[in-house]
Amino acid sequence: MSTPIETAWQLAKARYASLNIDVEAALEQLDQIPVSMHCWQGDDVAGFENTGGPLTGGIQATGNYPGKASTPDELRADLEQAFALIPGPKRLNLHAIYLESAQPVARNEIAPEHFRTWVEWAKRHQLGLDFNPTCFSHPLSADGFTLSHPDEKVRRFWIEHCQASRRISAYFGRELGTPSVMNIWVPDGMKDLTIDRLAFRQRLLSALDEIIAEPLDQAHHIDAVESKLFGIGAESFTVGSNEFYLGYAASRGTALCLDAGHFHPTEVISDKISSAILYVPRLLLHVSRPVRWDSDHVVLLDDETQAIAHEIVRHKLLNRVHIGLDFFDASINRIAAWVIGTRNMKKALLRALLEPTETLRKLEQNGDYTARLALLEEQKSLPWQAVWEHYCQCHDVIPGSEWLQQVRQYEETILTQRQG
């Protein structure tokens, strides 16, 4: 006797088949799309340097929900709990401050050995790893400048940190058999009116060129650079603007990172994908949810998340676009935040794969915009949820909201026992 989920799956499959959509082929494709989940949701971007310093760089994690991870083992345990509730392929995105060492390590001296435990853990869980140098929350970034700093000694420190980070990223790729995407974002900017913008950008350009000068195998490591409109304390001038990094990625052949919260509130990165991909070899996406500013709220299954997925799938860019998440909400259960956001990204990808894109494309090419709009709206109410629940069951993942019960149980038995 079939279950309600199985019955719904068979009905959904037939409904989509009537529109010439192969649901099983869509699920096979979904199984080839990893989403890179960010580790820093689990501890509010604290890391394991244990310096006691504040989070800086014009970013904030607001809230004080109990039970955040404070050790590498706690963070990995929390990640495992989240991964168990998310179907399909996944990656983990690490920042340099998540190193493990018995002794303090200067950021310009970090090495693969400080991330060996992460690599062994990733092997056990069949995960790829991505990486980021951490150019904030440090005494040498306290004045708001790193790679564009006027002081050559400070600038040299951050150049060396990024160079060391690239070698760690390449180590990830070699060990795990999948390239690590390493994204460079720096908080460099000015609170108020800035006279010599060009000098700051010239220094950043020179520093980046020095950082990527060491040849690394792209089968192991991919460079990416990320812009931002502004940050707290850098409202008037950001050195690494969109124009700067688009030009840099296009001229140097790096990937360009588009963060959903790093543009003006009236801009969306879904509209930028098809333009930027004409000029750069790859894109890295930081899917987030900005609420009036780069607030990094948990990703919803909203119009923009869906539009991002549509742009990737419609233009067959899955081999050139790397999907990562970037949010950190300390006001709710952090494991639930991971699960909600990552499942929503995967749901958006599934819905995009189930779209009758070629039919819509022909309508557009023929100028039948009435039918295009009608079909776009009608397909929103097709039974994609039944397909999603079947997909979850195929991966031994709880399909509906019942997953929250497991999170609550983990919270009661594990998170409530933690200090702080």
From Swiss-Prot:
Q: Pathway it belongs to?
A: Carbohydrate degradation; L-rhamnose degradation; glycerone phosphate from L-rhamnose: step 1/3
Annotated GO biological processes are: L-lyxose metabolic process; rhamnose catabolic process
Q: Where does Mn(2+) bind?
A: 262, 294, 296
A GO MF annotation of the entry reads: manganese ion binding
Where in or outside the cell it occurs: the entry states:
Cytoplasm
This molecule's function is given as: Catalyzes the interconversion of L-rhamnose and L-rhamnulose.
Q: Which PANTHER family does the entry link to?
A: L-RHAMNOSE ISOMERASE (PTHR30268:SF0)
HAMAP family xref list: RhaA
This chain belongs to which protein, by name? L-rhamnose isomerase
Source taxonomy: Bacteria, Pseudomonadati, Pseudomonadota, Gammaproteobacteria, Enterobacterales
